[in-house]
């Protein structure tokens, strides 16, 4: 018997490249916008299961929603009258890339700034309404945001209206420097004048409400509500831990933590906010 012998030749199969196209057509494609991943429980959710309120059916997490979606959930159909749309955002510091960022945010959200302001009816109650949209440069507060909210309070004083604001913000808009920081004082002064007139001011804290907005008008309401698990604070968690050199509780800066410590009056489910707003406005004199 031969010690060495040639290996048997195997049959070689050459791939038929012409079949590649036909194979790919048989592979089903899943649309990118069909599912959403819950940031809280990490489950993949069929978007239609979120409903109009955008609430996770597994853990009840409240997804961040746009100003227009919030408007649809809150006010009486056809009652919203948008105001102060002619105020244009400037670039006082000629900050590099700021104009491009603004333009992109406008195209993405359909808004001309980070807050939607106007008058509306909620179950028959007339209110002055502001809704901040975190999809617009994280709803950072610049000169236009501050001016629109200030004018809303001034209009409310003239027309004897309660003010309802849904807050959401990453803080002051750094691209406008000190001009953005002064909006904190300007809006707070308008809130005080509205209060002096004996009118009702309701704030609803949504995720996230931070920075200069928290330090000014967000916490100035006669009654402060919050959506479940909303992040609410001034400085960031890591900044605080570094400063005080202590580990903070896991639920620190969550709406429930603030309620436990007296900073929030009530946590209200998103689906119940419309009824709650109408009830509180009517109880405090109404807006008819």
From Swiss-Prot:
A zinc finger (C4-type) spans 38-59. It is found in: Cytoplasm. PROSITE patterns: COA_CT_NTER. It catalyses: N(6)-carboxybiotinyl-L-lysyl-[protein] + acetyl-CoA = N(6)-biotinyl-L-lysyl-[protein] + malonyl-CoA. Binds 1 zinc ion per subunit. Pathway: Lipid metabolism; malonyl-CoA biosynthesis; malonyl-CoA from acetyl-CoA: step 1/1. Its EC number is 2.1.3.15. The keyword Nucleotide-binding applies. Keywords: ATP-binding, Cytoplasm, Fatty acid biosynthesis, Fatty acid metabolism, Lipid biosynthesis, Lipid metabolism, Metal-binding, Nucleotide-binding, Transferase, Zinc, Zinc-finger. Residues 34-288 form the CoA carboxyltransferase N-terminal domain. GO terms for cellular component: acetyl-CoA carboxylase complex. One of its GO terms (molecular function) is acetyl-CoA carboxylase activity. Zn(2+) binds at residues 38, 41, 56, 59. Its main location: cytoplasm. Its cofactor is Zn(2+). It comes from the Bacteria. The keyword Cytoplasm applies. GO terms for biological process: fatty acid biosynthetic process; malonyl-CoA biosynthetic process. Acetyl-CoA carboxylase is a heterohexamer composed of biotin carboxyl carrier protein (AccB), biotin carboxylase (AccC) and two subunits each of ACCase subunit alpha (AccA) and ACCase subunit beta (AccD). NCBIfam families: accD. Belongs to the AccD/PCCB family. Component of the acetyl coenzyme A carboxylase (ACC) complex. Biotin carboxylase (BC) catalyzes the carboxylation of biotin on its carrier protein (BCCP) and then the CO(2) group is transferred by the transcarboxylase to acetyl-CoA to form malonyl-CoA. This is Acetyl-coenzyme A carboxylase carboxyl transferase subunit beta. The gene is accD.
């Amino acid at each position: 018997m031969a010690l060495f012998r040639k290996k048997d030749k195997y049959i070689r199969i050459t791939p038929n490249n012409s079949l590649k196209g036909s194979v790919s057509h048989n592979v089903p494609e899943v649309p990118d916008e069909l599912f959403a991943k819950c940031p809280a429980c990490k489950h993949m959710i069929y978007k239609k299961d979120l409903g109009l309120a955008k609430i996770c059916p597994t853990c009840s997490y409240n997804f961040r929603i746009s100003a227009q979606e919030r408007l649809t959930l809150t006010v009486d159909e056809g009652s919203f009258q948008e105001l102060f749309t002619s105020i244009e955002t400037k670039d006082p510091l000629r900050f590099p890339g700021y104009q491009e960022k603004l333009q992109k945010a406008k195209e993405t959200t359909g808004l001309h700034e980070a807050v939607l302001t106007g008058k509306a009816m909620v179950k028959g109650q007339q209110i002055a309404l502001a809704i901040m949209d975190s999809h617009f440069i994280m709803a950072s507060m610049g000169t236009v945001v501050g001016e629109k909210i200030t004018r809303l309070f001034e209009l409310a004083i003239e027309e004897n209206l309660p003010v309802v604001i849904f807050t959401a913000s990453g803080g002051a808009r750094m691209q406008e420097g000190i001009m953005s920081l002064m909006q904190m004082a300007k809006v707070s002064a308008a809130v005080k004048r509205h209060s002096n007139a004996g009118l009702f001011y309701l704030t609803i804290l949504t995720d996230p409400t931070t920075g200069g907005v928290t330090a000014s008008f967000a916490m100035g309401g006669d009654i402060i509500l919050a959506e479940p698990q909303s992040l609410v604070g001034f400085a960031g968690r890591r900044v605080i831990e570094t400063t005080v050199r202590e580990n903070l509780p896991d639920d620190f800066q969550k709406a429930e933590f603030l309620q436990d410590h007296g900073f929030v009056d009530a946590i209200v489910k998103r689906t119940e906010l419309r009824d709650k707003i109408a009830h509180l406005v009517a109880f405090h004199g109404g807006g008819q």
